[in-house]
Regions:
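Active-site and NAD+-binding cores of ADP-ribose-processing enzymes
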Residues: 1-113, 118-148, 152-154, 179, ...
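DNA-binding interface regions
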Residues: 150-151, 157, 169-170
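A short, exposed loop/beta-hairpin motif centered on an aromatic-Gly-Thr core
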Residues: 160-165
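Short active-site loop/helix that positions an aromatic residue
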Residues: 169-179
Length: 318
């Protein structure tokens, strides 16, 4: 019964295996968002015996908002294609502000007890006569005085330092390009409770979400709990943020080009994160175009530099 719910089947279809092929990113996301919206509309008309009528009605009430989201994302990308950068940012920031109530968030310290890993190509071992503190800083984000070394990556534009960390050393190595010679460090984000860094969480995948929803609803119904609305809203939020999460997760077709169009939308999202006081970064799954990272439970986090100290490092991250 559970696996036959039409909404379940549609969501499992959208498993973040996102590759634009010969289409440009604007065309690809326009087709992908439109198909997602149409599939959700069809799904609410089908058999959803497990989720039930209450959830279906909740989702129906949000279909207009979902349609807007699916239309606005390609509009933003098209503005960027036309070189209208100011309009791109304005429309993007408006969308992200509008989406704030739907975003999942997670504190940084909740991952592996706050332990993360960073790898950089080269030898950063501390040798005799070297300043250990200065050497360790070289494994942190690039200082503001060395902005000329900052390239463009998924969540960062050239010249704007961003700290990328992984919850697993192996994933950090893959993300670094699998260098033969490298140094790594383990970092502890030792904040707790409500003091942790707040991350917008794009790491959820449909099989994980639906598995959790199934367990929660079965337990709630067996115990005659009245809080099933909480679980319905959790699933609703997943559906509503999927188009944005997808736009930030398209696999790169060619990393050797000077301009990577798959990075346009996630870079825009991170610029919004940089300017808001409510969030500190993004938690996300790897989008490397390789089966070596498929199925890994590890995640990445990206933390933009917001406020510099005198030594060129971020005031809160350092």
């Amino acid at each position: 019964m559970i696996k036959d719910d039409r909404i379940y089947q549609v969501l499992l279809k959208y498993n973040f295996d996102l590759f634009r092929g010969d289409k440009n990113i604007t065309e690809y996301m326009r087709e992908h968002c439109n198909q997602f919206y149409c599939d959700i509309c069809d799904a609410v008309k089908g058999d959803n015996s497990f989720l039930g009528e209450d959830f279906v009605n909740l989702l129906k009430d949000e279909l207009g908002e979902l349609q807007d989201i699916c239309l606005i994302i390609p509009e933003i990308l098209e503005l960027n294609d036309r070189g209208l950068i100011k309009a791109t940012y304005e429309k993007g920031f408006q969308l992200f502000e509008r989406m704030k109530p739907y975003f999942y968030t997670r504190y940084s310290w909740r991952e592996n007890g706050g332990f993360y890993y960073r790898i950089r190509q080269g030898d950063f071992r501390i040798k005799a006569g070297e300043d250990s503190k200065e050497k360790k800083m070289q494994l942190f984000h690039i200082k503001t005085t060395l902005r000329n070394r900052v390239g463009a990556y998924r969540y960062s534009v050239a010249g704007s330092p961003c700290l990328y960390l992984a919850s697993d050393r192996e994933l950090a190595w893959f993300e670094c390009g699998m260098p033969k010679q490298f140094s790594y460090c383990q970092m502890l984000i030792d904040e707790d409770n409500d003091n942790g860094l707040v991350l917008v969480d794009f790491s959820f995948r449909p099989v994980d979400v639906l598995s959790s929803i199934t367990c929660w609803l079965l337990n709630a119904r067996l115990q005659d709990k009245k809080d099933v609305d909480v679980y319905y809203k959790f699933l609703l939020r997943y559906i509503m943020i999927y188009p944005i999460a997808a736009a930030c997760s398209v696999k790169v077709k060619d990393r050797n080009t000077k301009f990577v169009e798959e990075y346009v939308f996630p870079q825009l999202f991170m610029q919004w994160i940089r300017e808001t006081d409510e969030f500190d970064g993004v938690r996300y799954k790897s989008s490397l175009n390789t089966n070596l990272v498929d199925g890994m439970g590890a995640i990445n986090i990206a933390l933009p530099v917001k406020e510099y100290r005198a030594d060129g490092l971020d005031r809160r991250l350092a």
